[in-house]
Every structure is written in structure tokens, then in C-alpha cells.
Swiss-Prot record:
The lineage of its organism: Eukaryota, Viridiplantae, Streptophyta, Embryophyta, Tracheophyta. GO terms for cellular component: cytosolic large ribosomal subunit; endoplasmic reticulum. Keywords: Ribonucleoprotein, Ribosomal protein. GO terms for molecular function: structural constituent of ribosome. It comes from Arabidopsis thaliana (Mouse-ear cress). GO terms for biological process: translation. This is Large ribosomal subunit protein eL27z. The gene is RPL27A. InterPro entries: Ribosomal_eL27, Ribosomal_eL27_CS, Ribosomal_eL27_KOW, Ribosomal_eL27_sf, Translation_prot_SH3-like_sf. Belongs to the eukaryotic ribosomal protein eL27 family.
Length: 135
């Protein structure tokens, strides 16, 4: 069987608090682990998407509208839908299973991930990932 849940693949979450949000797979566990015996993956996604910027907005307002909020989550393969898109964003050294467990590591990891997502948004790459899913 071909493994389609590879790191860098953009997915849409189907269950939980972040239902309908877009995320990118950071690390996949196809055979499971000791704690979770099913296939799952560590994802980093967008909790809050950037707003639409118009020409007459000031620089301050444009900066505010370009902000994103992100999240990390370990999620079952059954609860994600893979897309055809990939994000070549290197979050492997930022996000780890150990960063999720402790509060202070998670806060620093979230800040680093937020900076990477915002930088990617400002360069204009992967436009689809930064638009809200309409349904």
C-alpha cells in the first residue's frame, strides 16, 4: 500500500476543535506507538487565517491582517483528509512530541511556527493553504 500521509502533505482536519482547518503533517506514525497503537500523525495547522488585505489599508492595519495563529496536534489518520497539496515548510526541528507535552516548550515552539507560517504567507507561496476553507 502506498503511504500518502507523508511529512509536508497538507491535510484538512475532520474531527475535534479544529474541524475544517488546514494543517501540514510534521511527522507520521504509520504503525502507531506504545501509547497510541493506531496510525496517527503530528500536525501543525492554522487556528486563525490571515484576513483579506486591501490597497487602502495602512501599513499597521496590513501587518495586523497578515497575522496567523497556529496549533499543534497529534491526530488519528481517520480524522484527517489528505489533499493534493504539499508544503515544503521545515517544521521538524521546531515541533516535536516532547514540545507538545510541556507548556513552556510548546509556547516557544508555537512562536517559531507562527513566524515560519507568517513568513511563508508574506512571500506569497502556497496561497491555497492560507485561505479559509469555505463550506
Amino acid at each position: 500500500m502506498v503511504k500518502c500521509m507523508k511529512p509536508g502533505k497538507a491535510v484538512i482536519l475532520l474531527q475535534g476543535r479544529y474541524t475544517g482547518k488546514k494543517a501540514v503533517i510534521v511527522k507520521s506514525f504509520d504503525d502507531g506507538t506504545v501509547e497510541k497503537k493506531y496510525g496517527h500523525c503530528l500536525v501543525a495547522g492554522l487556528k486563525k487565517y490571515p484576513s483579506k488585505v486591501i490597497r487602502k489599508d495602512s501599513a499597521k492595519k496590513t501587518a495586523k491582517k497578515s497575522r496567523v495563529k497556529c496549533f499543534f496536534k497529534v491526530i488519528n489518520y481517520q480524522h484527517v483528509m489528505p489533499t493534493r497539496y504539499t508544503l515544503d515548510l521545515d517544521l521538524k526541528n521546531v515541533v516535536s512530541a516532547d514540545a507538545i507535552s510541556s507548556k513552556d516548550k510548546k509556547v516557544t515552539a508555537l512562536k517559531e511556527a507562527k513566524a515560519k507560517f507568517e513568513e511563508r504567507f508574506k512571500t506569497g507561496k502556497n496561497r491555497w493553504f492560507f485561505t479559509k476553507l469555505r463550506f
